[in-house]
Amino acid sequence: MQAKKRYFILLSAGSCLALLFYFGGLQFRASRSHSRREEHSGRNGLHHPSPDHFWPRFPDALRPFVPWDQLENEDSSVHISPRQKRDANSSIYKGKKCRMESCFDFTLCKKNGFKVYVYPQQKGEKIAESYQNILAAIEGSRFYTSDPSQACLFVLSLDTLDRDQLSPQYVHNLRSKVQSLHLWNNGRNHLIFNLYSGTWPDYTEDVGFDIGQAMLAKASISTENFRPNFDVSIPLFSKDHPRTGGERGFLKFNTIPPLRKYMLVFKGKRYLTGIGSDTRNALYHVHNGEDVVLLTTCKHGKDWQKHKDSRCDRDNTEYEKYDYREMLHNATFCLVPRGRRLGSFRFLEALQAACVPVMLSNGWELPFSEVINWNQAAVIGDERLLLQIPSTIRSIHQDKILALRQQTQFLWEAYFSSVEKIVLTTLEIIQDRIFKHISRNSLIWNKHPGGLFVLPQYSSYLGDFPYYYANLGLKPPSKFTAVIHAVTPLVSQSQPVLKLLVAAAKSQYCAQIIVLWNCDKPLPAKHRWPATAVPVVVIEGESKVMSSRFLPYDNIITDAVLSLDEDTVLSTTEVDFAFTVWQSFPERIVGYPARSHFWDNSKERWGYTSKWTNDYSMVLTGAAIYHKYYHYLYSHYLPASLKNMVDQLANCEDILMNFLVSAVTKLPPIKVTQKKQYKETMMGQTSRASRWADPDHFAQRQSCMNTFASWFGYMPLIHSQMRLDPVLFKDQVSILRKKYRDIERL
């Protein structure tokens, strides 16, 4: 038996050896004959093979330097429909593989930072008001540059918003006009804004010209055509959308439970034929006429009667019974179904009204989805599951509804209430892509105050901002830096500035004192300053203008800043109490001198008053505590025009700081104690401090109020009637039981 096995193994080995020699010999002969041909061709002056010619060739899997358009055309015929083949040269599909890494030149942004250039408007070109607002928002931003050599991003002055060929706003011959721009460079580093694309009957997303490698900031863009980390999805907004500012959200107070008269509402057109008609034609199945009110009308378009169905008359009658605004403000959820295009005006209307949007538009890339978590503010539905929508929203807990409603208000006010905010959000998203090492995270974008007011260039650590202490489980700062703004020379040891310096230095919370010397006279000698237990740093301003008091000096070592005018009169106890109050409200201005604003109906302008009334809206920075971050925001967020105005007038810097902080926090400042007089009355009338007694000084502040309100687009100041006093303040109890007992004597 074993002999048979041995014979079988030998026979198998011999057969394998014979096969190996046979096939190997064939390949060897083929190789030799090929070699002879190559050698013969070499003798005749033809191609001579390289030494590594016979090594096997493998395709380069990485191919790091393949042009983007070559990648685009590669395997283009695989897995595409006949329609896609017909449209292969249209702008819908060209550049579909573009990403920041392949179609954006980062080197333009390294030298000068993120600067945006807007092409000059060409003669005879019509521009719609909405596009004018977009361009104005860019030109008024801190990103704008008029020098194309300094630019990182380019925006066309040609109106690209409405690319519906049936629209009167449609710009003809845009393809040739764009190609003739000398900076176009096939769209590289360009941003194109678009609200409407395509036309009847299919409303494709074709913008009608080759966008090349340009980015799209587009409304109603589908997830299929959206290029992640390259395009930006923006909301569809009307031509009446405000350019700046915008109305605040309509949620004035939180009701518990958060349920309203209607559970779910919608009022809009019903499309009888064509794209977008399926969902709206089926809404009547869900409508119950009680807490679910979904109304549609057939009365729109020129030939609606030609296509009207048996339900049209009944739907039109029901449609007229309800007021849309009344429904919107009294509904818990608002249905946002797709129209002819994926986006809808109902989306922004629902956000502003604190009506939780129920999205019913399959395939829509939601606005700013790259940074906004829409699950915190909306219910994402499915058109195929329309009949399940009512039961789904009824199952949502009341706590969740309240959280959704509050988030709608935050998102509306932070990113959508004006054209300017929509444009700036778009630019900030692109800037975060370019400078990823200092980009904002999801918490910043989805928590108050939002991504537009939190500048990552200030710090990459959230604990350095005053808004996230609770989220991070951090305590507010335990020390402050006193910054004293000095504008008069030292001529006497009894001057108020020296008394103020000593009082601030005695505070248990004081880490250091900075004297900002904005006086025309030279710095006094060191021995002229009093000895203190904390360091005293004297900084001489280079420009010596009013805005210099709010520069983000590196010398400020604490997050808390006690801002003081040189003639302020405060005791150590008052400083301590104000700081302990600020620790509970680190995002606000906390201090002593309060002022207010009002609307003057006779002059139709804002007014400024220092009269003592039952409310206030400003706390002046002559004796106030706030977070150091507001120095950075004042210097880098506000436009140069406002700061130049402050410097020229040598006035209004404290008002501008109050405008800024109220715009960020949406909250009023906090006044402490009932103290009214905070200035030294014995200051010499020849000093610059006597400007407070100058009537022109007060008139300038009136003018400043209106200029600031015009730039912000609304009045950000908020009135408050709250004043914080120490516990047992003025109570008829023993003085020994009171912590801040000296305050009552002042």
UniProtKB/Swiss-Prot annotation:
- One BP annotation, GO: mesoderm development
**Could you tell me the membrane topology recorded for this protein?**
Single-pass type II membrane protein
Q: In which tissues is it expressed?
A: Widely expressed.
Pathway where it operates: Protein modification; protein glycosylation
Q: Which residues are glycosylated?
A: N89, N330
PTM comment, free text: N-glycosylated.
Q: What is the effect of changing D567A?
A: Decreased N-acetylglucosaminyl-proteoglycan 4-beta-glucuronosyltransferase activity. No effect on glucuronosyl-N-acetylglucosaminyl-proteoglycan 4-alpha-N-acetylglucosaminyltransferase activity
EC number of this enzyme: 2.4.1.225
What does the record say mutating D565A does?
Decreased N-acetylglucosaminyl-proteoglycan 4-beta-glucuronosyltransferase activity. No effect on glucuronosyl-N-acetylglucosaminyl-proteoglycan 4-alpha-N-acetylglucosaminyltransferase activity
Positions bound to UDP? K267, K269, Y271, R280, Y319, Y324, R346, E349
| InterPro entries hit by this protein | Exostosin (IPR004263), Exostosin_GT47 (IPR040911), GT64_dom (IPR015338), Nucleotide-diphossugar_trans (IPR029044)
Q: Which residues bind a protein?
A: L166, Y203, H300
* Cytoplasmic topological segments: 1-7
Mutation: Q27K; reported impact is: In EXT1; no effect on heparan sulfate proteoglycan biosynthetic process
> So what does mutating R595A actually do?
Decreased N-acetylglucosaminyl-proteoglycan 4-beta-glucuronosyltransferase activity. No effect on glucuronosyl-N-acetylglucosaminyl-proteoglycan 4-alpha-N-acetylglucosaminyltransferase activity
Q: What is the effect of changing R340C?
A: In EXT1; decreased glucuronosyl-N-acetylglucosaminyl-proteoglycan 4-alpha-N-acetylglucosaminyltransferase activity; decreased N-acetylglucosaminyl-proteoglycan 4-beta-glucuronosyltransferase activity; loss of heparan sulfate proteoglycan biosynthetic process; no effect on interaction with EXT2; can be integrated in heparan sulfate polymerase complex
Disease linked to the protein: Hereditary multiple exostoses 1: EXT is a genetically heterogeneous bone disorder caused by genes segregating on human chromosomes 8, 11, and 19 and designated EXT1, EXT2 and EXT3 respectively. EXT is a dominantly inherited skeletal disorder primarily affecting endochondral bone during growth. The disease is characterized by formation of numerous cartilage-capped, benign bone tumors (osteocartilaginous exostoses or osteochondromas) that are often accompanied by skeletal deformities and short stature.
In Swiss-Prot or TrEMBL terms, this protein is called Exostosin-1
Q: Which organism is it from?
A: Homo sapiens (Human)
What gene name does this entry carry? EXT1
